[in-house]
Amino acid sequence: MNGKKKQALSLLGTGIFTVLGLVYIAPILIVLMNSFKKKVYINKEPFTLPMEKTWNGLENYLTAIDKYELLSAVGWTVFITVGSVLVILVCTSMCAWYITRVKTKFTKALYLLCVFSMVVPFQMVMFTLSLVADRTRLNTPWGIIIIYLGFVAGLAVFMFCGFVKSIPLEIEEAALIDGCTPLRTFFSVVLPIMKPTYISVGILETMWIWNDFLLPYLVLDLNKYKTISIAIQYMKGSYGRVDMGAIMAALILAVIPVIIFYLSCQKHIIKGVAAGAVKG
């Protein structure tokens, strides 16, 4: 009887999570289907598969790329995402290592400041940030990398600190005795050990920065630079006129890279979070 109850509960749980999964996947599938339809049929038949009379091939994708300069936006998005993630990983991991190994009032205050920054709402500083970015000429792809570093430093330092605490100090002392400088000790000894947390932080920040709309919209000089999220928003014409086919295609082009990236790396997120939080 207990075995039958367990089997029934297991089937019920599987059914519930399958339905929830379909609910989350359905909007993406609808966008994908409509990206291959002619514009006139997207509003008329949004939930049907593209057939012979509604099929538009790759025309919507070509329109999004040629007419709305989507490739340029993708290029700037890749540059900002990759540059930001690399700077975040290097700077925050070194900061966490210094905070953990050097026990002073300054490092304690720095750690508390990083933790405090995690609970400050973005809405509290966004208008001031936009003004400061314009005045200091940080309204470029290079400048926004520095701004992203400031915003995510708290969480990244917190995760790295938790992992560094689990690394035996004797390993670093042995490297120093062998003649390594502190900097070489970090890059040759500590950094390889911290790989799980590097991967975890890298994945989380890549997904956030790639999909971010509000911060680039407030900071960047939009006459020169647009990320893919902003470019899609600009595809809306005057008086509410929208090329739905091109927008559907642009959404698919925007979401495919991050889905592939996440699915190929998702197992490392749990490893990194567990290593950075539980061990600490």
Predicted regions and their residues:
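A hydrophobic, multi-pass inner-membrane permease signature
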Residues: M1-G280
